[in-house]
């Protein structure tokens, strides 16, 4: 009886082996046919407008959504964000200079008015160029929600504060000196903190 069971199992083993190989082969085929996720589920609205599946760059054919283009986009993203970081440090320096000039202007040194206006344009150019590089960079490959505190979450939260403060600083520049000063200090404090938080 035992011999019959052993012979039966030996006879059955090639069939079982073939069946397992077929299942494995089917899995490989289905994996090869699967479309890899090229875009993250979560994207900033500005990224979705340009780089999303139905974004402007996809619809116009400038950047069709495929693996080769996504590799190029990720390299472009890296250079955008590196430039964003460098501009961030430079802009922080110009903000400090603008704060010193602005302080002297508020203390009655009216000879610095034109310098203050010019420096304001320099700060704005650096700030809004840096912001655009971040907001319009191609999206990452994945963008999962993480629990708890992280430096990137703090950086993004502070960005919403300093962006609003920068816009307000420009809106009230000529009409309300007190509001202009308060908005400028808020922009500087939140911006400097965002730079420090992201560094550490």
Where are the language model's segments positioned?
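Hydrophobic alpha-helical membrane-anchor/signal-helix detector
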Residues: 77-106, 115-138, 153-174, 180-200
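Intrinsically disordered, low-complexity sequence elements enriched in Ser/Thr/Gly/Pro
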Residues: 1-2, 46, 153
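Bacterial Sec-dependent N-terminal signal peptides
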Residues: 1-21
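Juxtamembrane helix-capping/reentrant segments at transmembrane boundaries
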Residues: 146-154
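N-terminal targeting leaders of membrane proteins
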Residues: 16-114, 131-146
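Intrinsic low-complexity, intrinsically disordered segments enriched in polar/basic residues
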Residues: 2-4, 72, 110-117, 181
């Amino acid at each position: 009886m035992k011999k019959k069971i052993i012979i039966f199992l030996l006879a059955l083993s090639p069939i079982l082996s073939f069946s397992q190989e077929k299942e494995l082969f089917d899995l490989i085929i289905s994996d090869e046919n699967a479309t890899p996720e090229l875009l993250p589920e979560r994207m900033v609205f500005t990224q979705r407008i340009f780089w999303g599946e139905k974004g402007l760059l996809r619809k116009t054919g400038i950047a069709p959504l495929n693996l080769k283009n996504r590799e190029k986009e990720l390299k472009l993203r890296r250079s955008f964000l590196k430039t964003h970081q460098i501009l961030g440090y430079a802009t922080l320096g110009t903000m400090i200079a603008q704060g010193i000039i602005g302080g002297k202007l508020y203390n009655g040194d009216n000879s610095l008015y034109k310098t203050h206006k010019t420096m304001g344009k320099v700060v704005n150019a650096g700030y809004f160029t840096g912001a655009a590089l971040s907001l319009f960079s191609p999206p990452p490959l994945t963008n999962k929600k993480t629990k708890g505190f992280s430096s990137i979450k703090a950086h993004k939260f502070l960005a919403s504060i300093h962006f609003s403060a920068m816009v307000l600083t420009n809106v009230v520049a000529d009409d309300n000196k007190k509001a202009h000063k308060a908005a400028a200090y808020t922009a500087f404090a939140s911006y400097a903190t965002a730079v420090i938080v992201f560094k550490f």
